Amino acid sequence: MKPRNSSPVTDAVTITCQLRRYEVNTVIFSAIIEEIRASLGLDDYQVGITFVGSRAIRTLNHQFRGYDKVTDVLSFPQIEWPKPVPMSKKPNIARRAARRSARIASRATVPLLLGDIVISIPQAAINAANIGQTLERELCFLVVHGFLHLCGYDHIAPKDEKLMLKVQREVMRNLGEDSRRPIWRNCVKATSGRRKRA
């Protein structure tokens, strides 16, 4: 898998797209990622986001999880987090997450690598079509979902899924889910997929 374009957007964020037929707007994705990091109290953590095709994510899913099938998002955490706990009726995710991440960050002398998120744009497009959403919104949702997995959230057990969905909804609201101009507008566009001649 050779990167089509890679951009170390900041010292803490790297965005790579390995597909010719899609162009990701690294400025918009950087803003999305910075808002997610702020929402979850992860300002001191580095993260990498890679956008791939169906074949690449299927290979990774088989290699690392034992599932020989295409999926939409994979997360590769580099930190073992304490298990997330349910929030009170009036959640303040940012405050709770900041305390949680500060405990881990306080032990480090250099910025910590939170992990890597790999997203299949073709699978995200299928998901978006199936649920009547835009590709842009679905990609943003998958970045949030991937971040939560990096932070130890999961959705296997019903109570864990309920907690993860609650946090996911709040972060999506912080990204403009309920506004007319969500942050993810124009974060990706389809291209012809052909190489430009010199």
Which residue ranges define each predicted feature?
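An acidic/histidine-cluster motif and surrounding catalytic segment
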Residues: 1-140, 150-198
